[in-house]
Structures are given as C-alpha cells and as structure tokens.
Amino acid sequence: MARSSSWHRMSNFMRKYRKIPHSSFKTKWNENLKQKYAMEELRSNLLTDSENASVMRTLLSSFQLHNCEPTPQAYRFVIKTLAKSSQLENISSVLYHLEVSEKFDTPESIFRDVIAAYGFSGRIEEAIEVFFKIPNFRCVPSAYTLNALLLVLVRKRQSLELVPEILVKACRMGVRLEESTFGILIDALCRIGEVDCATELVRYMSQDSVIVDPRLYSRLLSSVCKHKDSSCFDVIGYLEDLRKTRFSPGLRDYTVVMRFLVEGGRGKEVVSVLNQMKCDRVEPDLVCYTIVLQGVIADEDYPKADKLFDELLLLGLAPDVYTYNVYINGLCKQNDIEGALKMMSSMNKLGSEPNVVTYNILIKALVKAGDLSRAKTLWKEMETNGVNRNSHTFDIMISAYIEVDEVVCAHGLLEEAFNMNVFVKSSRIEEVISRLCEKGLMDQAVELLAHLV
C-alpha cells in the first residue's frame, strides 16, 4: 500500500528539524581534556615562576585559558608546591579563594596537606585554625584530618598539652575518634613516658569495643618495661591485666618482659614467665633461653641453669656465642673453671667461635683463682685465634700483674694498649705510675704521666 503524501511531508520535517542530543560521555571527555591541558599549563607556569608571587592569578589564568573551572586537584597541587618551596604565607590566599569563590565540595586531603605543611613548619596555631574551619569549605572533617593535626601536636610536649581541648571540640563537630586516632595518642604518651595514661586509653578502647591493634599492646608493654622500675614493678600482673583486654602476647612481648625482670634481678619470676609462655603455646627461642639463663645465674640457681641449658639442647636449639658466654659465666661463678674451659672447647667443636667476652670471663676467673699462668696462656691464645683484646681484657691483666707485684709487665701492657689506641682507665694508669715510683722506675713513670693529660 502506497504511503500518503502527508506522511512524506512529516518525515521530511522531522529529518530537517529534529535535534540530536550531545553524548554525555563526549561532553565529560571534552571537559576532562580541557582540565588536563589546564593542569599542564599550571605546572609549567609554577615551575617558571620560582617565587610564585601571584599564585592565585596563575591558577585562575591557566584554567581560563582552556575555558574551564579550577579543580580540587589544581588547588591541592598549588598548596603542595607552596609547601615544598617554603612559601607558606601564600597558602592563606589560596584557602580564602577556595572558601569564597568555589562551589565544589572540597576534599579532605587538601586540608591534611595544609595542616601538615603548617604544623611541621612550627605554625601550630594556623594548623589548628585550618582544622576547625574545614566546615566553611563545604567539607565534613573526620579522623583523617584530625589525625593529621594530632601527628603535628604530639611532636612536642608543649603542643601535646593542647590535645585534650582539641579532642573535645572535634567531637562536638561530629568527628568520630577511630583506632588510628587512639594509636597516635598512645604512641605519643609512651614516647614521653606517660605509660599510665596510655594504659588508661587502651582500657577505654577495650571497654568502648574499639578493635585494638595487637601492635599497640606490644608498644605499650615495651614502653612500660622501658619506663618502670624493673626492681619492683609488677610487670607480670600488668601483663595479666592486658590479657583481660583481649591481648595475646607473642614471642617478642614475652622477651621484653623477661629482659625487664632480669634487669631487676628477679630470676625466679623469669622462670615463671617462661612456663606461662609454654602454656600459651608460644615456642621460646634461643634469645628467651639465654635471658632466662642469665636471670637464674644472677640468682645463683645453678642447678636450674644446668637444667635449662640441657632443655634448650633437647629442643634442638643450637647455642650461639652469647648463650655460651652466659653459661660459662655461671660455671666460673661456681668456681668450676675446668668445666668452663671444657665448654669453650666444645664451642670450637660445634662451630661457635669464642669472642672477646668469652676470653674476658675465663681470664678474669683464672686471675681470681690465682692461676696467672693459664690466664697468660689464654691471653696469647686470643692473638693466635684473631680475637682482638678490648679495654676490659687489658684492665683484667694489668690489675693481675699489679696484684702479684709484676709492675714492669703491667707497664708493658699499658704501652701495648696505648699503641693499639685501646682506652685504659685513668685510675689504672695512676696505680701503675704509683707502683713504678715505689720501685724507683721514675723514667717509665714520667712517660706514663703524658697519658693522663
């Protein structure tokens, strides 16, 4: 059937006058392209103008040239450029224009950059002011920018005192404190030794059902052991309190507690921590056993030390030179010098070379036992085995020679120490000078006087 003429007239009219809408994709793509060229123009202009005297004019002209509006990324780039070139006085004009002239919602990242730039340059008041003015920029502040401000404030004790007031005001603004916020505060308190306040914060987090990062517990425990009195503080009870807040101590945490107890001369308690560690199915390593050995030997519980040494061997742990030194020292304290010498011999067979500490322990024990002959043998053995003598080695032997009235030998060792640039205590030099004078060896005594100046 043939179409009517009216249909053809309508069809021609539609083809001639209908409007085809622009693709939104093409419009967005075109806008992005213009903004890209504007950013390139801005970068180029800012690099050319090293002083950035008219930074806002540069920003606006770069985007006007490409017929588009400045973007948040452009503002952030300008602020970062000013911060890097230490032109912080120009940031305020950028912020003013951003607040008054722009309409977009300003990203929080811009304020984080400004706060960091001001804060780390010592402009604390300006950093605080920027944080509280964030709502004026069509932006809702959160823990993201609050954390940036806290990181600035906690650097110094003076500005740290401002934190409580700022936290109260931030909460009134609707800022929710997150785990990361508490972490910053606890780290700062631990650093300045306010471990009791840090502990209270952790307890508050636990009661408020905030998930606490295990590393935060470890940081707190480490700080407590650093700042508390190791001779009397109940660190085991403190550890139990932390357990109640869902903390499961690991190998490093137990090691910190053990070392703290040993420093306080509390060897028996160290053993109880080792036993608790095993109950918690945390496998002790060689460092743990070495620390516990040190503690029980300091308490003169030598049977326990022997048992622990056998235990670590049965567990397949290979003692290193530090473990051997602790155990050899225990044998020497029991006057079992033969056993100590055999242990050093075993070290060589098992591939753990004795170091200067090993020799110092044995030489001192031999001197104390009056066996200067074997002490001299070990002294020579050190040189043969390539073990460098330190100031403590020289001090032990010089003192031994003075004790048996062999002042000439003591003088010889002093000269050797000076030639090797090894430090010798002034009191020891004075003692040798006094003995030389008593022997009438005035020339040698006068030579040594130069080393006291």
Swiss-Prot record:
It is found in: Mitochondrion. InterPro entries: Pentatricopeptide_rpt, TPR-like_helical_dom_sf. PROSITE patterns: PPR. Residues 1-77 form a transit peptide. Keywords: Mitochondrion, Repeat, Transit peptide. Its main location: mitochondrion. GO terms for cellular component: mitochondrion. PPR repeats lie at residues 107-141, 142-177, 178-212, 213-249, 250-284, 285-319, 320-354, 355-389, 390-424. It comes from the Eukaryota. PANTHER family: PENTATRICOPEPTIDE REPEAT-CONTAINING PROTEIN GUN1, CHLOROPLASTIC (PTHR47936:SF1), PPR_LONG DOMAIN-CONTAINING PROTEIN (PTHR47936). Belongs to the PPR family. P subfamily. This is Pentatricopeptide repeat-containing protein At2g38420, mitochondrial. It comes from Arabidopsis thaliana (Mouse-ear cress). The lineage of its organism: Eukaryota, Viridiplantae, Streptophyta, Embryophyta, Tracheophyta.
